[in-house]
């Protein structure tokens, strides 16, 4: 289920047909940052502005959306995509989605051992507590999709440790949000990260694998 406020935010962006930045050669992330700011700045001019808080640099997610109930908060990551796969791995975002931890409890940075410790000790199935993505199509900015991480159908697992879980937006956009249990989503995302790491180790040269074993 997608909360009404998030559907309303998505519809506002869809109807505005926001101008998306031209790609900057070798600097795709720069263009994406510009687009994220453009989307949030637009929302702050609408009647939804009182529900929108722009996150500071280095905070997880790009904005916080307050529910109409005046209490519930949704962490939203804004993506602009040409329909290709996009890196969507976020330790803090996933930790928030799968635990009872509040926004003010989230660590600034953490390693994987700390991530696993917290996600196991604070594990909680809370409806609509998720790490949300709003994806705007770079080729047609009226094509906007809203998904929670737990609702994604098209996760891709990679052996690249800096780019592990990706979303295939081209496939995702034509599908309805995935309905699955908390445990099923946990396996896809949290255990999916483990599978990515194992793939990375498996692809190492034998000499390096031996060094890894010695270190462990």
Functional labels for PLM-detected ranges:
Residues 70-72:
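Short acidic/polar mixed-charge low-complexity motifs
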Residues 1-59, 68, 80-216:
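Nucleic-acid endonuclease domains
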Residues 63, 74-82:
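Conserved catalytic cores of phosphodiester-cleaving nucleases, focusing on short active-site segments
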């Amino acid at each position: 289920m997608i909360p009404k406020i998030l559907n309303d935010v998505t519809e506002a962006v869809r109807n505005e047909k926001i101008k998306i930045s031209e790609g900057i050669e070798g600097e795709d992330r720069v263009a994406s940052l510009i687009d994220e700011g453009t989307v949030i700045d637009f929302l702050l001019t609408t009647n939804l502005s009182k529900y929108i808080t722009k996150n500071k640099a280095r905070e997880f997610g790009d904005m916080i959306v307050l529910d109409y109930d005046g209490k519930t908060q949704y962490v939203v990551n804004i993506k602009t995509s040409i329909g290709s796969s996009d890196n969507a791995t976020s330790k803090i975002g996933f930790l928030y989605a799968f635990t009872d931890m509040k926004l003010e409890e989230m660590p600034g940075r953490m390693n994987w051992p700390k991530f696993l410790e917290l996600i196991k000790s604070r594990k909680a199935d809370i409806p609509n507590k998720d790490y949300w993505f709003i994806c705007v199509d770079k080729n047609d900015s009226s094509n906007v999709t809203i998904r929670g991480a737990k609702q994604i159908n098209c996760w891709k697992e990679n052996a690249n440790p800096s780019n592990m879980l990706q979303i295939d937006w081209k496939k995702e956009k034509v599908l309805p949000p995935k309905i699955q249990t908390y445990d099923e989503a946990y396996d896809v995302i949290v255990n999916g990260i483990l599978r990515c790491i194992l793939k990375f180790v498996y692809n190492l040269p034998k000499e390096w694998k031996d060094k890894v074993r010695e270190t462990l």
